Amino acid sequence: MNDILLISVLGVGSYGAKAMNMIMDKMQKNDQDDTFITNKNSNEFVFYAIDTGSQTLTNSKVQDSLLLSDALDQESLADQKLEEKLQQMVGDSDLVILVAGMGGKTASTLTPAIADRLKAINIPTTAVVFKPFGFEGEKSEQNAEIGISKLAKLVTTLKVLENNDVTAKAQNQSEQQIFAQVDSEVADFVLSFSEKHFVA
């Protein structure tokens, strides 16, 4: 009996799409690291990205991607056949993990919409998202809160990372090091699902 799970990791928005490259690179590094044991019993990961910006998707190393228009209201998403395209993309998955940086219009609106469609087609879904830094402004914070509130009702597991917490812990570190820490936490969460004993 093959109980290895097919896990689709779906990056949403600009950060989510970029994060797919970072997670894949870390997975490859772990596979080459003698201290990290990967074997044939590990779950299988496939990576995808959805965004409204073509440049982000062009630079992504994912297996497949989906470019949507900037119109993200329910009617527009229906016109773009989002549910049908998700079915084609991840319909065979045992679990979908959504990755997004909340605060901007795309991720804050689209991530809950995707989770809603995945729930409609009965695909177990979890998500890891992070809230914006304080300097990104009140509007970004409001967008993130609304998006996260909606998302929490649609996924089985939701991990919310606080960028401000990362900043507080990262005293005397460069901006690049802070962003790398955020990326690392996202990757660690996703790759924690690699062992086959995980049950969706």
Spell out what each predicted region is.
Residues 1-200:
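Tubulin/FtsZ superfamily GTPase core signature
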